[in-house]
Curated annotation (Swiss-Prot):
GO terms for cellular component: cell tip; cytosol; endoplasmic reticulum membrane; Golgi membrane; nucleus. It is found in: Endoplasmic reticulum membrane; Golgi apparatus membrane. This is Pyruvylated Gal-beta-1,3-epitope synthesis protein 2. Its main location: endoplasmic reticulum. The chain crosses the membrane at residues 17-37. One of its GO terms (molecular function) is mannosyltransferase activity.
Amino acid sequence: MTKLWVNFFSQKLLRLLIPSIIVVFAFAALFAIYSPIQLGGINFYKRTNLFTVEELGEKELELSKTVTIDIYRKAMCMDDLEQSRKCTTFGLDPPISAHLFYTYNRDTGMNRVARQWNRRIPRVFHTIKGSNFIELSQFTAFEVELRVSHPNWAFVSWSHDDLNELVDKSYHNLHNAWSQLSREAKDQWGFLLGLYEYGGVWMSRSLQLKKNIDKFVYAAELSVKQFTENITSSTVEEFQPIFMAPKSLQYDFMIATPKHPFVLSLINELCKSEVLLKILSKRPYHGLDAAEALFAENRESITIREQEFFVNTYIDDGKVFVKNNPHIIFIPTEAFASTWDFLPSEESSEMCFADSPLFDPDYCISHSSKPDGNELAIYWSNSFDLITA
């Protein structure tokens, strides 16, 4: 009889323990893929292995291949676009007017757009034209290559008048500061303001993408989705904003979801910056350490029940929600090259910049930094933690 009772309770205990065992193994598998990292008090998670064909899908991997374009057909397309005509060779319409883009999205309400693109990147390229350096036909060649290799993306061109309209309508508090900026500085501010307002991909015309980026964008979205689905606790609210950039954060290439908190921190940092306006548009950030420093500079803390939390905190139904740091992804520098190249005395970066219209794109590409195999590293921390009040 005793043996029967022991067997009975053993079976009951085993049934009770099975769900816990499964949960333990699930979390063990999760953290085997996503290893925790702490930098300056900020908790990140890094994906330690790349996505497989089964996870990404053959379609996304196929899109990442370099597209070869016939030089003569490219020249014909360049001529059409420079004359604001449709490029029938590749079926490319002239760039969308930023005024029309702004008007349409303002009418639809950007808060709704932000919700629609939750955990996703809007498939739109934005570029700012009309800077005071010479507009080169080579930049149009870069545009043709970009658009042919990304057929499902929209392409929006912003002028300084468009940026002025954006500030007047959406950023009244920055109007006075904006009016005092140089054209170069307006490019930089407009870059960040537009990135925050609309999300998508913002890039300099002088930057040449060497690879299709659908794979990187999709991998980021998939990683966020997988991580969120594995966190079953009711203490985590499901919103993981995505920010993507080269390993050295540049104002020449950034990707983000709309209303991204890290982009807002960059804007705040610029507003407080004492850098001379003439060099304001040439101030790159270098890697994750600089990003972490920005977090530290742009946040204040509060104390709840002897625990310190940051200023992005709100109370709902007697519960305290604390907003932590956003999702940051660094993409391989080999995915793009630029036409710029700082002089040795200037601040340099992993990307290739040139402060002159005289450059050799092939030389730039061939001398761009080589990847070390760790660039496709995905970092994040949970966006919201719930604390019972």
